[in-house]
Amino acid sequence: IYAFVEIDSSGNLVVPAPSFLRSMVRLKEEKPELLVIAAIGGWAADGFSDAALTPTSRYNFARNVQKLINDYKLDGIDLDWEYPGSSASGIKSRPKDRENFTLLITALRDVLGPNTWISVAGTGDSTYINNSVEIDKIAPLITHFNLMSYDFTAGETGSSGQKHQANLYDSAVSLPGYSTDRYVRNLINAGMPSEKILLGVPFYGRLGATITKSYDELRKSYINKDGYEYRFDNDAKVPYLVRDGEFAMSFDNEVSIFLKAQYVLENCLGGIFSWQSTFDQANILARAMYESINNPVGYAQELEDTFGPIPQS
């Protein structure tokens, strides 16, 4: 997935780095089975509320998306509107955004046809499900739902930020009401088929609202270095760092990704994805994702040789 294509108030689309997107598409010459998807929007990306407002604006946007797909020979698009009905990121919002988002996706499916990839990136908390997206109505229209099951502490400061940002389950070190499993259950209960849910994992660490470090940075300068001690929360199924006795960083590693991949398989989810590949230049976590899905028995043994006994998912 290429992130991000920009959208303006008229529903026009701009590709900030067209040569990079074209280079991604060229990879299909070597791997024809590869799908290349363009993500539209992102945090603080304005324009969606206007694009979704009227039948004319919706179909104008859909035709612009069709042109983008044709011009770059893409397999589809991912809609990353953060979030319908909310101006928390500084974007324009309207009370009818929730219903209009469904109509926007309907127009896209009408223009793009039944086989083009259309996914939606979103969360699974009750506010999102109740106020931002009609999950049961968009479910038949989309190919997949990219569950952003991370950044749980992105709005937290102080001691509230000293919690896991992407825990699989609840624990004493997680924010009440926030877990990947809870998000998945909320989505399924709201009408999203499990096989359409793609589970997201972060390739970075977070402490509260403002401090983030790529996995490359964590591996080279933080994990068991400079006073930072590695620990693993067997309840939450994720690692974290402690410094001077205090929670210092939440992150995912090979073990937690393996456990999340097993969760995907055990719960018949559609797959797993990451945000974002540039934070893992050594492809350590990317390999963990691949091996955990495609070679779980062999990879589990490899992890045990490195980390010791692996907790049950």
Locations of regions flagged by a protein language model:
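Active-site groove signature of glycoside hydrolases
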Residues: 64-95, 151, 273
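Glycan-recognition patch characteristic of GH18 chitinases/ENGases
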Residues: 1-69, 162-163, 174, 178, ...
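Substrate-binding surface in catalytic domains of secreted glycosidases
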Residues: 9-19, 84-225
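Glycan-binding loop/region signatures in secreted carbohydrate-active enzymes
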Residues: 40, 153-170, 174, 195-263, ...
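Conserved beta-strand positions
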Residues: 1-2, 74, 79-81, 120, ...
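Conserved, mostly hydrophobic/aromatic
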Residues: 38, 79, 108, 145, ...
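Short, acidic/polar
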Residues: 53-71, 126-137, 180, 184, ...
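Short, well-ordered coil/turn segments that N-cap beta-strands
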Residues: 32-36, 73-77, 114-116, 141-143, ...
